[in-house]
């Protein structure tokens, strides 16, 4: 939210208060679900620092991690209302408003981060989504970052898709994750994230799927000694700003914010890419066996789900899927 300080500055000076202790011209807020130990928070810190430095102190950004301001859906609404200035959201999260945006999270549709970038910025579907974010939702997309790829841990080795059969797999209560478990032959078991460790420890479930950073942060490797590199869903993270905030900034400060968001996204991406490489080694040292099953049967198993997605989303979903499949290697 903009904090107008120029009038306050003039008043304070007239009262003899030093301008050095006064607030910035623009006092802004950045809300996120991620906690303070996350890569997202580290990148947001870099963003806030660069904006302050490059704006010569005119813009001050305060960070609100750990869903202090609500979940991502609530924060997107706050951006539209102008009560929050910045937040993160995955491209697929916009299925809340446009069902066809779920294409970004369909298992095995986005094969790598380069494809994720092209899907958002180069396809007609992606370009149209960015326009709708602006026009309908009141948010401007500043940049996109890589946010990890989901893998599968379990209490038995997964050497092929056959080993998924009957596996009680914890997934979040999201259609695409549920579909991954179902169509590879596992038994999808949705439950709250906070309950997963105990469920794995007591064998109430046989496995779970998450990016490697989450597996480490939640210490799932303590109670799961097998990790299959299933690479089933790639996550991105969008840096978003409220239109109300962005349009009130003069052009030179808009550029400062845009450039800082792009730099932060590069750092954000590097944290995840480097982290994933290091984590494989870390898990091996913890006694976790890493397997690399043939992913062709996994991908083939998803075809009925793609047909279901097209049936649910109609021509828009079918077009989006075809456009992204056309840029996959």
Curated annotation (Swiss-Prot):
Signal peptide: 1-23
InterPro entries: DctP_fam, TRAP_DctP, TRAP_DctP_sf
Keyword Transferase: no
Subcellular location: Periplasm
Keyword Transport included in the entry's annotation: yes
UniProtKB keywords: Periplasm, Signal, Sugar transport, Transport
Miscellaneous comment as given in the Swiss-Prot or TrEMBL entry: Is essential for lipopolysaccharide (LPS) sialylation and serum resistance.
Gene3D superfamilies in UniProt: Bacterial extracellular solute-binding protein, family 7 (3.40.190.170)
NCBIfam families: dctP, TRAP_S1
Protein family (similarity comment): Belongs to the bacterial solute-binding protein 7 family.
Function field: Part of the tripartite ATP-independent periplasmic (TRAP) transport system SiaPT involved in the uptake of sialic acid (N-acetyl-beta-neuraminate). This protein specifically binds sialic acid with high affinity. N-Acetylneuraminate (sialic acid) can then be incorporated into the lipooligosaccharides (LOS) as a terminal non-reducing sugar, protecting the bacterium from complement-mediated killing by normal human serum.
Subunit: The complex comprises the extracytoplasmic solute receptor protein SiaP, and the fused transmembrane protein SiaT.
GO terms under cellular component: outer membrane-bounded periplasmic space
CDD domains, per the entry: PBP2_TRAP_Siap (cd13672)
Phenotype when changing residue 150 to A: Complete loss of incorporation of N-acetyl-beta-neuraminate into the LOS
Principal location class: periplasm
Effect caused by changing residue 170 to A/K: Complete loss of incorporation of N-acetyl-beta-neuraminate into the LOS. Large defect in N-acetyl-beta-neuraminate uptake and binding
Positions bound to N-acetyl-beta-neuraminate: 33, 72, 90, 150, 170, 210
Organism: Haemophilus influenzae (strain ATCC 51907 / DSM 11121 / KW20 / Rd)
An example Gene Ontology biological process: transmembrane transport
Record's protein name: Sialic acid-binding periplasmic protein SiaP
């Amino acid at each position: 939210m903009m904090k107008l300080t120029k009038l306050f500055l003039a008043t304070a000076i007239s009262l003899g208060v030093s301008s050095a202790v006064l607030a910035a011209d623009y006092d802004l807020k950045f809300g996120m679900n991620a906690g303070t130990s996350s890569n997202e928070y580290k990148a947001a810190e870099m963003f806030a620092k660069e904006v302050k430095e490059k704006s010569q102190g005119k813009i001050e950004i305060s960070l609100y991690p750990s869903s202090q301001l609500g979940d991502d859906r609530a924060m997107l609404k706050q951006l539209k209302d102008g009560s929050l200035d910045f937040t993160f959201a995955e491209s697929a999260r916009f299925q809340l408003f446009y069902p066809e945006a779920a294409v970004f999270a369909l298992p095995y549709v986005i094969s790598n981060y380069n494809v994720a970038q092209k899907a958002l910025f180069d396809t007609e579907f992606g370009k149209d989504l960015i326009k709708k974010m602006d026009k309908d939702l009141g948010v401007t997309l500043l940049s996109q970052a890589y946010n990890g790829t989901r893998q599968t841990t379990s209490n038995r080795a997964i050497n092929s898709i056959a080993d998924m059969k009957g596996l009680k797999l914890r997934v979040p209560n999201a259609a695409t994750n549920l579909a991954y478990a179902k169509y590879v032959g596992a038994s999808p078991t949705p439950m709250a994230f906070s309950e997963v460790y105990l469920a794995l420890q007591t064998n109430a479930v046989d496995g779970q799927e998450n990016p490697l950073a989450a597996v480490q942060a939640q210490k799932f490797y303590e109670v799961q000694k097998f990790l299959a590199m299933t690479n089933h869903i790639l996550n991105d993270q969008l840096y978003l700003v409220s239109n109300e905030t962005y349009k009130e900034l003069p052009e030179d400060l808009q550029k400062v914010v845009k450039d800082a968001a792009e730099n932060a996204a590069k750092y954000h991406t590097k944290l995840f890419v480097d982290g994933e490489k290091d984590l494989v080694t870390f898990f091996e040292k913890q006694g976790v066996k890493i397997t690399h099953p043939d992913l062709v049967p996994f991908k083939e198993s998803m075809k009925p789900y793609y047909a279901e997605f097209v049936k649910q989303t109609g021509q828009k979903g079918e077009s989006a899927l075809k456009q992204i499949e056309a840029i996959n290697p």
